[in-house]
Structures are given as C-alpha cells and as structure tokens.
Amino acid sequence: MAIKGVDISEHNGSVNFSTLKNNGVEFVIIRMGYGSNYTNQDDKRFAENVKKAEAAGMPWGAYLYSYAKNTSMAKSEAEHALRLLKGKTPLYGVWYDVEDPQLSGVDVVATSQTFCDAMEDAGYYAGIYASLSWLNGSLNSSKLDKYDKWVAQWNSSCTYKKAYGIWQYTDKLVIGGKNFDGNWAYKDYPSIIKAMNGETEEEDDEMLTYDQWKDYMERYEQEKAKEKVSSWAKDAVEFVQKEGLMNGDADGSFRPQSNVTRQELAAVLKNEHDK
C-alpha cells in the first residue's frame, strides 16, 4: 500500500487543494513553522493550509523545522508546535524536521527525543523527518527507534534499512504547474491515530435480531391495517365480499397496501371453485 502525498509550506504560495486531489494526492504534511516559540517564526500559511485541507476532506500532518542546539531549545520548539496545534487533529502525525547544517555536532538524538516525547505526552503521534545521510549518521541511535521515520531520499527507491512510514522521493513533483515535494506513505495513519485516540469506526447500519425484526414487521402491518381501502377499489372489495370470493382479514378489513400471499390467492381460487 502506497499513498500519494505532498508536503507544503508558505514557500509553495497559495495551494489549490482541488488540483492536488484531482492529481491523486491523498494527504498533505504542512509546515507549522521553524525554531523556538516565537510568533514571527510561524509559517504564514499554516492556518490557511490546514483550513483548506480540512475543507477538501484531505487528512493532514504537520512538521516543524528545527534549529535546536540543546534540549532547552527543543522544548521551546515543542511549545511552538503545541501552540499551533491546539484544537487541531493532524491525522498524518507531527514530525520533527532535522536537517539544518547548523545542527552539525549537536546532540540531535537528545533534541529529537525531547521534541517527540513532548508531542506524545500531549497525545500526538510523533516522528522524525530527515535525509538518509542524517538517519544513517547523527540520528542513527536505538534511542530513536521507537519513533516513526519520514525519510528524504530523492531516488528511484528508498534504501533506508530501518523501519519507516513515509518516503519523500522527490522535490520536483509538478502538479498544476507548481513544484512540490512528493511523498509515499506506507501506513494508514488516520486509522492508527484515531485508534490511538480511542476513536473507532461506527457501522452505518446495525444488524437486527430476529425478535427485533419480527416486532418491527408486526408494528408495520398494524400501521398498514389502519389504512382505508382506496376509493378506486371500493366497488371491487364490496363485490368480492358479497360474492364470497374474499373475506379479508379476520375483522373483515382489507389491507390496501399489502401484497397478496399465495395462501390468500389459494383461498380466493377455492372460493370460486366451490361456487
């Protein structure tokens, strides 16, 4: 199972979600912002893109670009994400984008743990976005194995050896004349996250037991029995009663909307034969 998606930020400008859907895109991961918890570091189109995705019925995830050089900065980045996510439901998870050259030599294992743990503590599904070289290098730690991975490798195949859920395979996916980062997701994230949050899919229809069905049919017949004979059939009903061809129900009534059963037809034919 591979699900087609894109990731977007303010750098993509105004995104037409109908065009995305018409080109087979089924999910989008939206940048929240970058760095520590300052409003001037919010992505200027985050709220707009979330609103558009939800209006289009497209599940979305979110990511924050990291500049954290220590766990204190990572905590601020987590606060940044949580502020922007308040009241929202990212069904494709929350991702920590670790790729900036300034992070060379930083303990990115510790900063990634800090951010992802804060997301999970808040009830979100957390993962790490990074290039193949970062994942095989500075981020290659068993401490991070419990977090999902979103692998950036612009190639014909993903060669990351550990488990991952999303592969960003290109930065040149052209849709509607615009360039996007193209992604394949290999997990049903909406189902996973709904289950994590205790949500279940409700059945549209419930099966009736035999007793429930029987009770329903009896009440249905009772209501139908209250209906009067249609005016166009009144003469015919009076005739068959007078001639003894049909007697109706036990109380002499006729159910105008009911089907004639085989046993009722047999009674009519017998009455005619006996004459």
Predicted regions, residues:
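Short beta-strand/turn micro-motifs composed of small residues
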Residues: 64, 130, 153
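Substrate-binding cleft of extracellular glycoside hydrolase catalytic domains
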Residues: 1-116, 120-125
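Glycine-rich, charge-decorated loop segments at or immediately adjacent to ligand/cofactor-binding or catalytic sites
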Residues: 73, 134-144
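Short Gly/Pro-enriched loop/turn and capping motifs at secondary-structure junctions
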Residues: 101-103, 133-136, 155-159, 171-174, ...
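Aromatic-lined carbohydrate-recognition surfaces of secreted/lumenal glycan-active proteins
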Residues: 123-136
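Short, solvent-exposed alpha-helical surface patches in non-cytosolic proteins
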Residues: 204-275
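Functionally critical loop-and-helix segments that line ligand-binding/catalytic clefts
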Residues: 1-12, 17-22, 140-207
